[in-house]
From Swiss-Prot:
Similarity section: Belongs to the PanB family.
Subcellular location: Cytoplasm
Disulfide bonds: none
Full protein name: 3-methyl-2-oxobutanoate hydroxymethyltransferase
A GO BP entry: pantothenate biosynthetic process
Quaternary structure annotation from Swiss-Prot or TrEMBL: Homodecamer; pentamer of dimers.
Reactions mediated catalytically: 3-methyl-2-oxobutanoate + (6R)-5,10-methylene-5,6,7,8-tetrahydrofolate + H2O = 2-dehydropantoate + (6S)-5,6,7,8-tetrahydrofolate
Transmembrane portions of the chain: none
EC numbers for this chain: 2.1.2.11
Keywords: Cytoplasm, Magnesium, Metal-binding, Pantothenate biosynthesis, Transferase
Ranges in coiled-coil conformation: none
Organism (species): Shewanella oneidensis (strain ATCC 700550 / JCM 31522 / CIP 106686 / LMG 19005 / NCIMB 14063 / MR-1)
Pfam families xrefs: Pantoate_transf
Alphabetical list of InterPro entries matching this protein: Pantoate_hydroxy_MeTrfase, Pyrv/PenolPyrv_kinase-like_dom, Pyrv_kinase-like_dom_sf
Gene: panB
Amino acid sequence: MSKVTSSTLLKYKQEGRKFTALTAYDASFASAFDGEGIDVLLVGDSLGMVLQGHDDTLPVTTADIAYHTRCVRRGIERSLLIADMPFMSYATPEQAMENATTLMQAGANMVKLEGGHWLLETVTKLTERGIPVCAHLGLTPQSVNVFGGFKVQGRDAENAQRIIDEAKALEAAGAQLLVVECIPASLATAITQALTIPVIGIGAGATTDGQILVMHDVLGISSGYIPRFSKNYLKQTGEIRSAVRAYIEEVANGSFPSAEHTFN
């Protein structure tokens, strides 16, 4: 089976074929997800919450992400591997270059950065030097203290237009993928239609080109608050690989995310 690349995902978008992504943090789970056909694996800074037990993602370091990226890389053959750049690891273009290089050398195919217009120079410099970028808009968890909590973004017209404008600008700067998180489904639709690059949604409705979830939510092993946009597939299947297959099938046929997982 051929490896998934950014070109593969672009082809999927052009064909109207939905694709799936999951977080992964170790070789064993990554191998299972890869083997069942998950297209994209993200070593997310969500590990700060689901693995390290923090209340948010801010304590995660580049060294943490690099370690787990190396673990995941050893377990996969097909999936595209994206590594999150953690809080304050890309405050300047120079800092971003150094830390992104570390993550690419750890085995990532692409790095993910949260932010809008202020990131444009950084995105351009990274892509010009051979480091592919996945951008991230909407609810950006590293800005949780600015937002005043984990809240849906883009519900008013002004902020919705700002997010659309930032999405277009990030694409023009060289981003090859975009994640949109916790935004109204109508806004996600507008962004997906406005961009040539694939758009991956989480809590953003069913019209994005792909969907991503945190593996701990999919497998029902998260502690504490479970986001509305998530679904426990292990509960309905009883087996990890079957849960992953059910997730893939429901994204492909459009039954996930449903209205109960979507914000308006």
